[in-house]
């Protein structure tokens, strides 16, 4: 056992930095005079918060040439969570884009000491994640294929290599390790001071103590930032206030979904076996034991993540606010909470049993509901940006500072990072939900990360569709931006449990039945989570012509349109319907609702357009009806003529279905004959029941989003967030049909796209068939050719029509021809894949056109690379 001297620390309110270098006192003494006495009454950017993230942003903005960067800290730099952090740094992240953030952070930290002259205390002994179960080995294989097409070094290593790198381990249960060279740890205090020195070197002003007391927006989009020392007029503000971020948000009426969590770690005295080592131990992560462990001088530092039942939220701070003056304080330690993890660590690293504990640190870190930070501009409040919710702020700080700086300076994100968008949360994100999800996220820190993962705490939210009660007992629901939406349906006798897997699991056969339901008969899907906006006004047409690369649809018609960034990348995909002259209905995906709305609102403000923009997402439900018998079923319920001649593809009309008012758009993401029916949310259940009743003779049935994904892939329909995002341009994504470079309007990104077209493409999106066994592509897997990684998948599914896996992938142009053979890496094995002519299955409108022209309509022979709907 750890020696009982540790227990004497229980009940003590520990004070002071647990790891501050002996020279830190001198540096800290030099810090106050370094805070300049001058005051600026104007600033380009005011950053609120002097933790590692805020100081990093100040450094990056100033270094990039922005004048008048002002950082305001309420007490002193590093106060809050930075000063007591364990300081871990890693290239690894399961999220694709966050790997770039981690990479940028580490590369900055490697050069920062030379650049600023400040010691940062950066150690890079590498890190090892331990697999002690077969499913964990599968997870490592899954993560390898998602990493191979990145710059990050990462390897699966055998037990012998693990023992060589970390000779103090008990190897009895270890099956494999995931090894990242270059990982390690850094002193958070020294890092922040180095960033501060760099920020000042490049002209930023760092003021502290300078608590912000008031934020006042002005009509021109600027802000008055008030402090006891005076007021500053700022073109933008960035809330980087850590666990004070909620208080800052409340100054302007925002309730950020953040909550402080108590996180403990233990520091031991010198351990002879550690001291005797000739090199520093790599950072260790025992995932089943749910803890990290690293060398601290000649001892060890051990940090666990307790279960959600044992962990402790600082919920009182959400209710009553952070105690005044709290800055470099800690909570009372509680070793009982982490005793199970200590025992697991002592079994894995036996030398811990005879170690003395010299310090227990229990400090606050801030969690968002999904554990990811909130980074970017906030919808509904102009020029208000956030960089908060960092559960892992030290490794995120450098990269996020660079990311935000680039976005602020260039008007668009440097790469896609939608998972950190603060606008992924909305009014549905209550305090109760935030608490439940933060507790779950903390407790799930080290669980196996499966594809199609679902987490159930805090559900359902208040944001359920009108069909939730009707459908919940017969389907597996998925969570989408607060909504519950059916993923797949089950029938009596089928396995209904949530069984995540890296291979095909219990939903595979039911989804196949739903696929056949739509292809052979008629299916109904709840699409209520769609984001829905109404735009009208004198300048509505001009605004949309400026925003979208496609032409504006005629009255009574719909088209698919894309908003591009100034650099010609795909910011969003929406359907645009002109309901009446100058009045438009815009539809986007559930996950991009406020993301897209903010972009539209900002363009309207900047251009001075006279428009009215309404978010009607929660007011309306949507039912999708699709399949060869869709028209026959719906025609029973309305006097409106639904024939091809009367109701054309992409046409929109408003009429009644069984006395229920609907706006119907003839479009379906399945690619089959279908309509989307927009209606009052309170009418959803009645409309659904009447459609299902009318379709009994046709064998009508439900289908969910898993079947929808299989259907859209066969039709070669792209998905925003997968095939297209801020990392892609529409030409390489095969979206030429929807981009009208010859239209008169100078839409955002037009000139950049012309330049891209002139220079030629370097890569292209292709469709692949993959000869697999019991595993299917999910997206972001590596594409191999002649022993080298040449690209990546973007999404995938099983094709129930040809009984093979299907995937979209980006590959070099020279490897993009139909018939080209490549390989797709899945769970550590490379499977043969072939580029096919897309679409695999023709859409219903395309089949109808060919039939009208008297041509053969082989469902599995698409005529061209680009599918015209």
Curated annotation (Swiss-Prot):
Pathway: Amine and polyamine degradation; betaine degradation; sarcosine from betaine: step 2/2. GO terms for biological process: amino-acid betaine catabolic process; choline catabolic process. FAD binds at residues 52-53, 73-74, 80-88, 212, 244, 390-395. It is found in: Mitochondrion. It catalyses: (6S)-5,6,7,8-tetrahydrofolyl-(gamma-L-Glu)(n) + N,N-dimethylglycine + oxidized [electron-transfer flavoprotein] + H(+) = (6R)-5,10-methylenetetrahydrofolyl-(gamma-L-Glu)(n) + sarcosine + reduced [electron-transfer flavoprotein]. The modification N6-succinyllysine is found at residues 141, 310, 312, 427, 469, 516, 648, 786, 788. Its main location: mitochondrion. GO terms for cellular component: mitochondrion. Its cofactor is FAD. InterPro entries: FAD-dep_OxRdtase, FAD/NAD-bd_sf, FAO_M, GCST_C, GCV_T_N, GcvT/YgfZ/DmdA, GcvT/YgfZ_C, TrmE/GcvT_dom1. The modification Tele-8alpha-FAD histidine is found at residue 84. (6S)-5,6,7,8-tetrahydrofolate binds at residues 573-575, 669, 676-678, 737. It holds the Pfam family GCV_T_C. GO terms for molecular function: dimethylglycine dehydrogenase activity. Keywords: Acetylation, FAD, Flavoprotein, Mitochondrion, Oxidoreductase, Transit peptide. The modification N6-acetyllysine is found at residues 107, 141, 161, 216, 328, 353, 427, 469, 516, 648, 757, 786. This is Dimethylglycine dehydrogenase, mitochondrial. The gene is Dmgdh.
């Amino acid at each position: 056992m750890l020696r009982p001297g540790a227990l004497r620390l229980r009940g003590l309110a520990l004070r002071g930095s647990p790891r501050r270098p002996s020279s830190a006192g001198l540096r800290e003494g030099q810090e106050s005079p370094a805070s300049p006495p001058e005051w600026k009454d104007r600033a380009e950017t005011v950053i609120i918060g002097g933790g590692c993230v805020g100081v990093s942003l100040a450094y990056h903005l100033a270094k990039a040439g922005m004048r008048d960067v002002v950082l305001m800290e309420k007490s002193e730099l590093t106060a809050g969570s930075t000063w007591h952090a364990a300081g871990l740094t890693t290239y690894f992240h399961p999220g694709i884009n966050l790997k770039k953030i981690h990479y940028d952070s580490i590369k900055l930290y490697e050069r920062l000491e030379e650049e600023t002259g400040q010691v940062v205390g950066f150690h890079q002994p590498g890190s090892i994640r331990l697999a002690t179960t077969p499913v964990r080995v599968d997870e490592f294989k899954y993560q390898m294929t998602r990493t191979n097409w990145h710059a990050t070094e990462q390897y699966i290593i055998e037990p012998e290599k693990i023992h060589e790198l970390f000779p103090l381990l008990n190897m009895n249960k270890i099956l494999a390790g995931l090894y990242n060279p270059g990982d390690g740890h850094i002193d958070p205090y020294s890092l922040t001071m180095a960033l501060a020195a760099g920020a000042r070197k490049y002209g930023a002003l760092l003021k502290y103590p300078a608590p912000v007391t008031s934020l006042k927006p002005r009509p021109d989009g600027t802000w008055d930032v008030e402090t006891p020392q005076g007021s500053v007029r700022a073109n933008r503000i960035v809330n980087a206030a850590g666990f004070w971020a909620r208080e800052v948000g409340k100054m302007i009426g925002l309730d950020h979904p953040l909550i402080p969590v108590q996180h403990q770690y233990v520091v031991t005295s010198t351990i002879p076996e550690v001291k005797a080592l000739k090199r520093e131990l790599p950072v260790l992560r025992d995932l089943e034991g749910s803890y990290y462990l690293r060398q601290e001088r000649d001892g060890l530092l051990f940090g666990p993540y307790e279960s959600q039942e044992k962990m402790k939220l600082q919920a009182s701070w959400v209710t009553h606010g952070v105690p005044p003056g709290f800055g470099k304080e800690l909570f009372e330690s509680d070793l009982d909470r982490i005793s199970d993890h200590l025992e697991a660590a002592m079994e894995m690293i036996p030398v811990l049993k005879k170690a003395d504990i010299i310090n227990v640190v229990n400090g606050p870190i801030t969690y968002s509901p999904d554990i990811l930070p909130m980074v970017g501009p906030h919808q509904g409040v102009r020029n208000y940006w956030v960089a908060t919710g960092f559960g892992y702020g030290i490794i995120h700080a450098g990269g996020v500072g660079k990311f935000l700086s680039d976005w602020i300076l260039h008007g668009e994100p440097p790469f896609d990072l939608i998972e950190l968008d603060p606008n992924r949360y909305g009014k549905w994100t209550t305090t109760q939900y935030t608490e439940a999800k933060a507790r779950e996220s903390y407790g799930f820190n080290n669980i196996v990360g499966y594809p199609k993962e679902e987490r159930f705490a805090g559900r359902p939210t208040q944001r359920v569709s009108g069909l939730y009660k009707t459908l919940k007992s017969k389907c597996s629901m998925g969570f989408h931006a607060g909504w519950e939406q059916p993923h797949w349906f089950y029938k009596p006798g089928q396995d209904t449990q949530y069984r995540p897997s890296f291979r095909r699991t219990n939903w595979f056969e039911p989804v196949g039945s739903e696929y056949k339901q739509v292809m052979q008969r008629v299916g109904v899907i709840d699409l209520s989570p769609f984001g829905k906006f109404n735009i009208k006004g004198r300048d509505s047409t001009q605004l949309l012509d400026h925003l979208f690369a496609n032409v504006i649809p005629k009255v009574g018609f719909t088209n698919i349109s894309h908003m591009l960034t100034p650099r010609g990348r795909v910011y969003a995909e929406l359907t645009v319907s002109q309901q009446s002259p100058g009045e438009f209905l815009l539809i986007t995906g559930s996950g991009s609702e406020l993301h897209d709305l903010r972009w539209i609102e900002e363009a309207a403000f900047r251009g001075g357009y006279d428009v009215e923009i309404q978010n009607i997402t929660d007011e309306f439900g949507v039912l999708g009806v699709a399949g060869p018998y869709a028209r026959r079923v719906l025609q029973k319920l309305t006097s409106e003529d639904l024939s091809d001649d009367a109701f054309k593809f992409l046409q929109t009309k408003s009429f009644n279905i069984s006395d229920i008012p609907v706006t119907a758009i003839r479009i379906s993401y399945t690619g089959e004959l279908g309509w989307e029916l927009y209606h009052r949310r309170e009418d959803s259940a009645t409309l659904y029941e009447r459609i299902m009743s009318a379709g009994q003779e046709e064998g009508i049935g439900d289908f969910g989003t898993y079947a929808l994904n299989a259907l859209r892939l066969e039709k070669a329909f792209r998905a925003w967030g997968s095939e297209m995002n801020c990392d892609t341009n529409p030409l390489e994504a095969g979206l030429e049909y929807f981009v009208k470079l010859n239209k008169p309007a100078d839409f955002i990104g037009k000139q950049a796209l012309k330049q891209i077209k002139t220079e030629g493409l370097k890569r292209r999106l292709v469709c692949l068939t993959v000869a697999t066994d019991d595993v299917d592509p999910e997206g972001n897997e590596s594409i191999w050719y002649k022993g080298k990684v040449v690209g990546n998948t973007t999404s995938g599914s099983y094709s129930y029509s040809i009984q093979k896996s299907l995937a979209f992938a980006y590959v070099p142009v020279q490897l993009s021809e139909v018939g080209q053979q490549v390989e797709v890496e899945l769970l550590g094995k490379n499977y043969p894949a072939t580029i096919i002519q897309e679409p695999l299955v023709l859409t219903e409108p395309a089949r109808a056109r060919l039939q009208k022209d008297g041509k053969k309509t082989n469902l599995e022979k698409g005529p061209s690379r680009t599918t015209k709907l």
